Swiss-Prot record:
The lineage of its organism: Eukaryota, Viridiplantae, Streptophyta, Embryophyta, Tracheophyta. Pfam families: LRR_14 (PF23598), NB-ARC (PF00931), WH_DRP (PF23559). This is Probable disease resistance protein At1g12290. The keyword NADP does not apply. ATP binds at residues 182-189. It comes from Arabidopsis thaliana (Mouse-ear cress). GO terms for biological process: defense response. Residues 139-443 form the NB-ARC domain. Probable disease resistance protein.
């Protein structure tokens, strides 16, 4: 009996449920017309709400604000529902015609039910979006980093007071432009650097801080280039714009921002409007600060109350000197502290001199050495009046204490470059080797190592400073006062000014007048506007001639080279309009170093092949060059650079290169499969290979690129190739590196590749760029790498990924990345939703890691290993929209 009751209850419930379902379906069909009308009206209201909101957002963004994330999400949902509504509305007529029985029934109940249900659900979604579309705030101040923290010397003494004074003055509402003036070496740049770094640490509403080094050679296009790089104007299209067009772009961008512009080392008035800098006002809150040696420059910039940066007082000077010398040296003899005070006093409170002399004296632990320093400083102080003139001889004491004549000569050589120039280390060492300062006859690797040791010595002596690392190249700089001292020494303390003629960055239109060419040993005319070089100067002692970066230069007469029998180094690089060389270059019988890179020379003169002592020949990026046939006549060549040439590299040319028995360094570009095969089969050339570019090899010619072990290979570029895989020719154990010196790899336009697992065998890789390769799915393939017990990318500093639509993985597990500074994910990398990071990654690199992305939604899609990883690295993510 109980069972019957149970069945009756179950049947009742079932009937009720079926009834409700039928009524709901009937409701969807019966109310299609009414719901469609309501949906249409609701969509119109939603669009109006969206348009009003967008106007508010646009106004806020023009004022330099950034739209709230909830605004982005809401607008995205509106865009989606609008698209769905359009699809729904497109079938409206058909669906209404399907209804019958006065709209109560349908000729196809299932289709009408589905359509009616979609209308009903969409109406609810639209009403919900309308209710959530009211925002009290639509934007907030931009959250991206305002500037880059700049390195400072660890020892800064005596600037605390003036720093606070300068900061308060700059931040005062009445201050628009602040000028800092003082003699060279007094600490103006250090003070401006501290101001820059304080902006980076202070939440004061400033959106962007821009640092530009101007120097004596004021060039508008260079300043615009630096500013453009800071604010995201990069790429070929922008670089090709005129100065006026760039000024408009910069003005339009900065007019919407609260910016701070810091100009270091200006020598004359800077026309801010020509650059595109808006006038700072109380309304826009923008600021400009600059440093200069001359008070008159401050007045020309409209600053009539500049701040003078003065030499340190006696107590601060002594404190700085003590810190540089160190307690161990000062306590090595009871008389040394008293003598050391006299040496510090001779530095006249100039921080640069205190730093340089302090470094020099740090290893002097006998009273005799300290007495000698006092004698030198007091003697010069008596002979010179002005502080600047007195400082140069005192700085010379550090030069005199350099360990050898070769180190001294290498130091003086650095003064040939323009003021504030970044000097590429390896290029400088190549000069030194060819000049004979370093013995490079036996072992190039050992000679380069000695060059780096000399650079280290000069940096430790504070005579050079580290200039940083850019594009995989390391640089040094020379302080302008130290450079003045070096030029003073090179001219035999100004007794023979024509010994070393340096007119770098002087905007010369012609070769300078020289009283006596016969005594000139070195001449630097870098970065001028010289158009033609004529005449036949008699230069029996000239060994070095720098003519690079004279972009107006079109002609050099043959007579010019006739009387330079001892010329060893000739640099003609970056003379982009120079289309030929005279045959009389053969007269340069002592020439060892010749650089013609980035010139427009089409044919090498026959006379060049007579330069039997030539060791270093750089022909890179000579896009007009037709041939280098006959290069094997230059039997003494050790370095040949042939990257980025448009000429066809033939097998016969490779055979000529093989005949160069002294060849040690080769950079080369390959654009044919036969030449590539010839190159990789040549043990001699592979052994010398330092940089290689492989371009435009189609899939049929090279399906699989097999690379041998190349111990000295540093850079690889593979572009526009159709190979399906890159593999390693294995002759050693699986874990040994095939490319121990490979540091930079660029892969672009290789649409057959699916992974780059071969990079496992490049343990010192620092830069990896992968662009526009449509089939790459993994950087390191888990399947291929499963048998290799190698942790990749331990030295990687920069990882740039662009236009890789199929990329899903960099590596399947988190990696330590102890050196990683930047990850850049741009343009169509939508399937890459996870980075190989965890909370322990980048411990050494610390908070320096920057993750840049170009897709506004990527930051929301990215998956993190865990909450700790997300908290650690999410603040590092920055939206950067730019072209490659």
């Amino acid at each position: 009996m109980g069972g019957c009751v149970s069945v009756q209850v179950s049947c009742d419930q079932l009937l009720n449920h079926l009834g409700r379902c039928f009524c709901r379906k009937l409701y969807y069909i019966q109310n299609i017309k009414e719901n469609l009308t309501s949906l249409e009206e609701a969509m119109e209201d939603l669009k109006a709400l969206r348009d009003d909101l967008l106007r508010k957002v646009q106004t806020a963004e023009e004022g330099g604000l950034q739209r709230l994330h909830q605004i982005k999400v809401w607008l995205k949902r509106v865009k989606t529902i609008e698209s769905q509504f359009n699809d729904l509305d497109s079938s409206r007529t058909v669906e209404l015609q399907r209804l019958c029985c006065c709209g109560v029934g349908s000729r196809n109940l299932r289709l009408s039910y589905d359509y009616g249900r979609r209308v009903f659900l969409m109406l609810n979604i639209v009403e919900d979006l309308k209710s959530k579309g009211i925002f009290e705030e639509v934007a907030h101040p931009a959250t991206r980093a305002v500037g880059e923290e700049r390195p400072l010397q660890p020892t800064i003494v005596g600037q605390e007071t003036i720093l606070e004074k300068a900061w308060d003055h700059l931040m005062d509402d009445g201050t628009k432009i602040m000028g800092l003036y003082g003699m060279g070496g007094v600490g103006k740049t250090t003070l401006l650097t501290q101001i820059n770094n304080r902006f980076c640490d202070t939440d004061d509403g400033v959106e962007i801080v821009i640092w530009v080094v101007v120097s004596g050679d004021l060039q508008i296009h260079k300043i615009q280039k630096e500013i453009g790089e800071k604010i995201g104007f990069i790429g070929v299209e922008w670089n090709q714009k005129s100065e006026n067009q760039k000024a408009v772009d910069i003005l339009n961008f900065l007019s919407k921002k609260r910016f701070v512009l810091l100009l270091d080392d200006i020598w004359k008035r800077v026309e801010l409007t020509e650059i595109g800098i808006p006038n700072p006002t109380s309304e826009n809150g923008c600021k400009i600060a600059f440093t200069t040696r001359c008070q008159s420059v401050c007045a020309s910039m409209g600053v009539h109350d500049p701040m003078e940066v003065r030499c340190l007082g006696a107590d601060d000077a002594w404190d700085l000197f003590k810190k540089k010398v160190g307690d161990i040296t000062l306590s090595s003899h009871p008389d040394i502290p008293e003598i050391a005070r006299k040496v510090a006093q001779a530095c006249c409170g100039l921080p640069l001199a205190l730093n340089v002399i302090g470094e020099t004296m740090a290893c002097k632990k006998t009273t005799q050495e300290w007495d000698r320093a006092v004698d030198v400083s007091t003697t010069y102080a008596a002979n010179f009046g002005a502080v600047k003139e007195r400082i140069l001889p005192i700085l010379k004491y550090s030069y005199d204490n350099l360990e050898s004549e070769s180190v001294k000569t290498c130091f003086l050589y650095c003064s040939l470059f323009p003021e504030d120039d970044l000097i590429e280390k390896e290029r400088l060492i190549d000069y030194w080797i060819c000049e004979g300062f370093i013995d490079g006859d036996e072992n190039k690797k050992g000679a380069v190592g000695e060059g780096y040791e000399i650079l280290g010595t000069l940096v430790c002596a504070s005579l050079l400073v580290e200039g940083g690392k850019f594009n995989n190249k390391s640089y040094v700089k020379m302080h302008d006062v130290v450079r003045e001292m070096a030029l003073w020494i090179a001219s035999d303390l100004r007794k023979h000014k024509d010994n070393c003629i340096v007119r770098a960055g002087f905007r010369l239109n012609e070769i300078p007048k020289v009283k006596d060419w016969k005594v000139v040993s070195r001449m630097s005319l870098v970065n001028n506007r010289i158009k033609e070089i004529h005449g036949s100067p008699e230069c029996p002692k000239l060994t070095t001639l720098f003519l690079q970066d004279n972009r107006h230069l079109v002609n050099i007469s043959g007579e010019f080279f006739r009387s330079m029998p001892r010329l060893v180094v000739l640099d003609l690089s970056w003379n982009v309009n120079l289309s030929g060389l005279p045959d009389q270059i053969s007269e340069l019988v002592s020439l060892r170093y010749l650089d013609l890179s980035y010139s427009s020379i089409g044919r090498l003169p026959v006379g060049l092949l007579k330069l039997k002592k030539l060791m270093h020949l750089n022909l890179e990026s000579m896009l007009c060059l037709e041939s280098v046939s006959g290069i094997d006549h230059l039997s003494n060549l050790k370095t040949v650079r042939l990257l980025n040439l448009r000429m066809w590299l033939t097998i016969s040319l490779l055979e000529e290169l093989e005949r160069l028995e002294n060849l040690e360094v080769l950079t080369i570009e390959i654009i044919s499969s036969s030449a590539l095969e010839q190159l990789l089969c040549s043990h001699r050339l592979v052994r010398c290979l330092q940089k290689v570019s492989v371009k435009y090899l189609d899939e049929e010619s090279v399906r699989i690129l097999t690379l041998p072990s190349i111990g000295d290979l540093r850079e690889v570029f593979i572009g526009g190739c159709g190979m399906r895989d890159i593999i390693i020719e294995r002759n050693t154990s699986l874990t040994s590196p095939c490319f121990p010196n490979l540091s930079k790899v660029l892969i672009t336009g290789c649409n057959g590749l699916k992974d780059l697992t071969w990079l496992l065998f490049a343990p010192n890789l620092t830069h990896l760029n992968v662009w526009n390769s449509r089939q790459i799915e993994e950087i390191i393939s888990q399947e291929k790498a499963s048998t290799a017990d190698i942790v990749p990318f331990r030295k990687l500093e920069y990882l740039h990924l662009w236009d890789l639509p199929e990329l899903k993985s960099i590596y399947w597990n988190p990696l330590p990345f102890p050196c990683l500074n930047q990850i850049n994910v741009q343009n169509k990398c939508r399937k890459l939703t996870k980075l190989p990071l965890d909370s322990q990654s980048c411990i050494v690199a610390g908070e320096e890691l920057v993750i840049q992305y170009g897709d506004e939604e990527w930051k929301e899609r990215v998956e993190w290993e865990d909450k700790a990883t997300r908290l650690r690295f999410l603040p590092s993510c920055k939206l950067v929209l730019c072209n490659r």
